[in-house]
Amino acid sequence: MAPDKNLVERWKTAEILLLGGSAGSFKILFQIVKLFTPGLNKTVIIVIHRKKNFFSEIEKLFAENSRMMMREIADKDILNKNTIYIAPANYHTLIEKEGTFGLDVSEPVWFSKPSIDVTFESAAEVYKERCIAILLSGANQDGAEGLLKLRNNGATTIAQHPEDAEMDEMPAAAISIGAAEYILHTDEIFKLLST
């Protein structure tokens, strides 16, 4: 099925794409990263629950298959288009109104640091309707409240269909509180991001 025309238009005009996931989301993130080319003209931010040494592993795999620049976020990095940013382990990643990232060492949220909620909520304040956020597979509810705040601030919000998620708790939590404007199967997510 072709993606909703309104959703496609919002994707084309968005400045930033937020991707959040935990257990079971690595495969879909890997496929998403392969879709992007330098002409994307968007900032892509991935927040995934991971261990500290995980970046070198995913960086290698993603870099081999991505045509866009990819880097782990450092404090006060400027958000650039045509770049894929990965939230670092053991920090919460904030998006600041100055167009920079901030790293925060406060307590874990949903037993997670980085927390998807923290990043999504900060993006909601800055990017509002210029943002698209997708919440993927995960084994806890991190990201649901952040997705709701994004939706309430005008962002386009998507949850992976729980039937497709390896771990359905994260997208199901977002759907249950009305945070997901769109609920898309995995192939629909790929089609949207390919347009």
Where are these regions (language model features)?
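Conserved acid/base catalytic micro-environments in cytosolic active-site loops
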Residues: M1-T195
